[in-house]
Amino acid sequence: RLTHSSYNVLKRIGSIIEYPVFFDHSNGKENLELHCEYMGYYSPHCVENALEMLDLSKAGNKPVHNYSLGMKQRLGLARAILTKPELLILDEPMNGLDPAGMKQIRDLLKMLCQENGMTILISSHILSEIENFADTIGIINQGKLLR
């Protein structure tokens, strides 16, 4: 059961699953505004800022069903950072992104850590990409931490 204190904790955590889910007939901006509404967090600038950070400003007014997989992935990340969380949990954040998109996300994640002090936990099969920016890497095999 969610209480007022539950929302305070949830605002401190952002997350994205491998294939983020949205209301496809709503546009990107509306999806982010809805997320803000049910999280009890809304600032007129937070949605625009998140769209801009993920290079989705122009696409923000287009229905999500017109988005590519990479655009949906970036919209999912925009949703995850809306509340300026302390902890960001990402499952396959590079999924569906082209090399330029991967670099953009890598640079954004570095910036979020350096400028906002955000802790980021990433689950990924693309170890070579994660090694480009992670400061600590753990490898799990059959439920055991190997490294």
Could you say what each language-model-derived stretch is?
Residues E33, E37, P44-A59:
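Conserved ABC ATPase "signature" region
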Residues P63-Y67:
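Conserved ABC ATPase signature
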Residues L77:
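Hydrophobic anchor residue at the start of the ABC signature
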Residues K84:
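Conserved catalytic motifs of ABC-family nucleotide-binding domains
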Residues L88-E92:
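Catalytic Walker B motif of ABC-type/P-loop ATPase nucleotide-binding domains
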Residues K103-N116:
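Helical segment within the ABC ATPase nucleotide-binding domain
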